[in-house]
């Protein structure tokens, strides 16, 4: 059955702010305490979604989390009315309030790991929400993420939903940001590629020294088992710990794959030649590796421009398009390399850039903003159709953002009870627009 690779992008939430919460993410740290513009951020994301829809791709929308997360703040000892909880947390632990107000769920590459039905033992699409235990502000997402995924992919005949892995450092899981899939055609058996930063139980694997490795081998293996993947078509590889220490906090900051092509930096993986050999052996003939040499694009340029945090997509005419942040065009070395790559006809045919400044300043490029879901025709019909981008949804969500979102948020605004009310009103209306039901705690 013919299949497509759909992209489900996360809507930026109403509390989008720059709190510098993500250790190891240089852009997040460098923009800490700056004023954010949630309305601009959500509209930049919507523009990207609409552009992909207009190019002929199946484009979906995933709802954001409820923030500030009052329930978590109450678990941490703050009490009284919601306004009192905000006031107390701002007074005694502003860092906690910032963490519980993060709009980081916009980066749906971390929402879950997804395996298509052509790869799984039971012939269903499998979803496992990421536990994201390495960062507190993201570790409180997985329950609601699961609710949103179940409301988006509700038909049990086609979709299987798992709980997040245990909330332990042994099973640190960052979702699809450390996972990609290679295939000849999307609806055929593919090779699922899991990249980890460390092993929890086996000290023969080196670990980074400066920044944390967020994904463990054990987590990746558990997801492969849970999804019923075939060993022959599953490859595990370790990310180079030295590049983690230089700001490559997820594999999707240093590599991206699509169909038969792996586009990666020369320093992306530990034992890189063996990784390429393992992938080629599992894939078979025709596997294409575009390895970017350090003397063409330095690691620093790769991280600063988010060259590899791009989307590789296949157009209906068979050509491969790479969707890049505007930062790549603005860097002469990176832009020269990309144009040279297209001229060489090595597997990337066209370049397209987007202005995603609000997301980029918090450390997330085009690939961070999307969760890839391969769907055959029957599965596409089984998806909640109100979550799929079209002209009407684009118009509706822009009007919704104009109605509910602020155009400026600073740290002090997170304690404003009115922001909580605005956020809940926005999400309540959103669940009606997208027919999600009661996915948020405040709706119960």
UniProtKB/Swiss-Prot annotation:
Catalytic residues in the record: 174, 250, 368 (nucleophile)
Enzyme class, spelled out: hydrolase
GO MF assignments: N-succinylarginine dihydrolase activity
Positions contributing to substrate binding: 19-28, 110, 137-138, 214, 252, 362
Xref: Pfam families: AstB
Name the UniProt record assigns to this protein: N-succinylarginine dihydrolase
Record carries keyword Hydrolase: yes
Pathway note: Amino-acid degradation; L-arginine degradation via AST pathway; L-glutamate and succinate from L-arginine: step 2/5
Domain of life: Bacteria
Keyword entries, A-Z: Arginine metabolism, Hydrolase
Record has GTP-binding as a keyword: no
Function: Catalyzes the hydrolysis of N(2)-succinylarginine into N(2)-succinylornithine, ammonia and CO(2).
Reactions catalysed: N(2)-succinyl-L-arginine + 2 H2O + 2 H(+) = N(2)-succinyl-L-ornithine + 2 NH4(+) + CO2
InterPro entries listed in its UniProt record: AstB_sf (IPR037031), SuccinylArg_d-Hdrlase_AstB (IPR007079)
Entry similarity comment: Belongs to the succinylarginine dihydrolase family.
Taxonomic lineage of the native organism: Bacteria, Pseudomonadati, Pseudomonadota, Gammaproteobacteria, Vibrionales
EC number(s) stated in the UniProt entry for this protein: 3.5.3.23
Organism: Aliivibrio salmonicida (strain LFI1238) (Vibrio salmonicida (strain LFI1238))
UniProt record, GO biological process: arginine catabolic process to glutamate; arginine catabolic process to succinate
Subunit structure: Homodimer.
């Amino acid at each position: 059955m013919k299949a497509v690779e759909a992209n489900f992008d996360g809507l930026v939430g109403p509390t989008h702010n720059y709190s510098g919460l993500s250790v190891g993410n240089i852009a997040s740290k460098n923009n800490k305490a700056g004023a954010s513009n949630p309305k601009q951020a959500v509209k930049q994301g919507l523009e990207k979604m609409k552009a992909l829809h207009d190019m002929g791709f199946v484009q979906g929308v995933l709802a954001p989390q409820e923030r500030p997360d009052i329930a978590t703040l109450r678990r941490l000892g703050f009490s009284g009315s919601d306004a009192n909880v905000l006031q107390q947390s701002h007074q005694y632990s502003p860092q906690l309030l910032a963490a519980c107000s993060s709009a980081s769920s916009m980066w749906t590459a971390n929402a879950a790991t997804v395996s298509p039905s052509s790869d799984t033992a039971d012939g269903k699409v499998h979803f496992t929400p990421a536990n994201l235990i390495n960062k507190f502000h993201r570790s409180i997402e997985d329950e609601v993420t699961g609710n949103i995924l179940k409301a988006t992919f509700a038909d049990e005949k086609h979709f299987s939903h798992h709980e997040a892995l245990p909330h332990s450092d042994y099973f640190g899981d960052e979702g699809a940001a450390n996972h990609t899939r290679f295939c000849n055609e999307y609806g055929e058996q593919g090779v699922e590629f899991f990249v980890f930063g460390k092993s929890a139980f086996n000290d023969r694997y080196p670990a980074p020294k400066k920044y944390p490795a967020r994904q463990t081998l054990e987590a990746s293996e558990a997801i492969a088992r849970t999804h019923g993947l075939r060993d022959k078509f599953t490859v595990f590889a370790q990310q180079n710990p030295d590049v983690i220490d230089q700001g490559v906090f997820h594999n999707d900051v240093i590599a991206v794959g699509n169909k038969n092509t792996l586009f990666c930096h020369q320093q992306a993986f530990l034992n890189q030649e063996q990784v390429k050999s393992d992938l080629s052996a599992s894939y078979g003939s025709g596997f294409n590796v575009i390895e970017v040499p350090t003397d063409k694009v330095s690691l620093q340029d790769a991280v600063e421009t988010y060259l590899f945090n791009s989307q590789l997509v296949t157009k209906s005419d068979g050509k491969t398009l790479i969707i890049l942040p505007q930062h790549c065009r603005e860097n002469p070395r990176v832009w020269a390399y990309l144009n040279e790559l297209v001229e060489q006809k090595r597997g990337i045919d066209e370049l397209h850039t987007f202005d995603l400044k609000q997301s980029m300043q918090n450390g997330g490029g085009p690939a961070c903003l999307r969760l890839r879901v391969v769907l055959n025709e029957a599965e596409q019909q089984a998806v909640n159709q109100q979550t799929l981008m079209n002209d009407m949804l684009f118009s509706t969500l822009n009007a919704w953002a104009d109605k509910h979102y602020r155009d400026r948020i600073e740290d002090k605004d997170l304690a404003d009870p009115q922001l909580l009310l605005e956020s809940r009103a926005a999400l309540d209306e959103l669940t009606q627009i997208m027919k999600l039901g009661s996915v948020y705690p405040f709706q119960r």
